[in-house]
Amino acid sequence: MKYIALPNDKLLPELRKYDADGHVVLLSDKVYRLSFYLAMEEYVARHVNEEDCFFMWQVNPSVIFGRNQLIENEVNIDYCRENGISMFRRKSGGGCVYADMNNVMFSYITKEVNVGFTFNRYINMVAAVLRKLGVEAIPSGRNDIMIEGRKVSGNAFYLAQGKSIVHGTMLYDTDMRNMVGAITPSSEKLLSKGVESVRQHIALLKDYIDISIDEFLVFVMNHLCDGCIRLTDKDVKEIEEIEREYLTDEFVFGNNPRYMLVRKSRIDGVGDMEIRIEAKNNIIKKVNMLGDYFIVGDIDTGLLKRLIGVALKKENLEKALPDDLSEYVLNLKKEDFINILLG
């Protein structure tokens, strides 16, 4: 697997520095907006012809929420604005996370497009690296890595340019006050995981290893990658062009019209799902899906458009929808989806 480095990436071997005791000390490089790194993933998917690519990044305080999430439900917007925390939407599904310079974000781009295989391979690969550091890290659920029952890494997935992109957090350390203040997880989600506080729910890697965050970055790079591809200034300019989409208010805040009916539920193995329906005479006129589920197909064509003009009755919905909804949303069963629609 190749490591994708920016022109002056602090992880490049020739740019690394060491202290008197031989410990690596990485020089500060340019910190881009979180949206830049999302655009970089797309750029690598489009232009780097390698089987597997990987890179790591750190950002100033930011929250990043999933493609299908309603920002007002997930983010404490006032807190973020008052505390200088930037807000970004990504193109993958999954939930809302907080990131800052004390934790690390991972990006993995592969030609393998089978979602189950890709997730399994990537998460096991990262967990194996943590175990080499003496940490009892194990994959858990659909997208997490756990230490002693607490999450140290959460990951999300989407398809782009015929490749799979997996990205996620690695909690070396973090500002707990900002993490709690910036994100507003649903009480239902917390209850389902049996936790009473965010701190009980997460593990910080610094509590389990005795190396600095700089040493951790180098360790991961050395153990996951067998070579490096260095991007050019021209590549950076093209990435910044892709980034423009991520910065528009339309993309970040979305077009969220008012709907007459709101259906909410949490499905084991799928996640939180909120369906907003505008109906007239019990006929669906508009429908939108929100939540932290994972998209694996075209839900607009495969699911939502099929519902327009359909009566909100079980037999009508069964006829309108395809039998295998897991082709569009990971692990989603037709019966569960119809039950949510009917409230």
Where are these regions (language model features)?
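Long, positively charged amphipathic alpha-helical accessory segments at protein N-termini or as interdomain linkers
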Residues: 133, 153, 161-255, 299-343
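A generic structural motif
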Residues: 110-115, 206-210, 291-295
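Active-site cofactor/substrate anionic-group-binding motifs, chiefly glycine-
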Residues: 72-96
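Short beta-strand elements
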Residues: 156-157, 170, 273-293
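Active-site loop/lid in soluble adenylation, ligation, and acyl-transfer enzymes
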Residues: 2-71, 157, 202-217, 221-272, ...
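Contiguous, small/hydrophobic- and glycine-enriched helical/loop subdomains that border
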Residues: 103-143
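Residues forming anionic-ligand binding surfaces in small-molecule and nucleic-acid pockets
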Residues: 91-110, 188-206
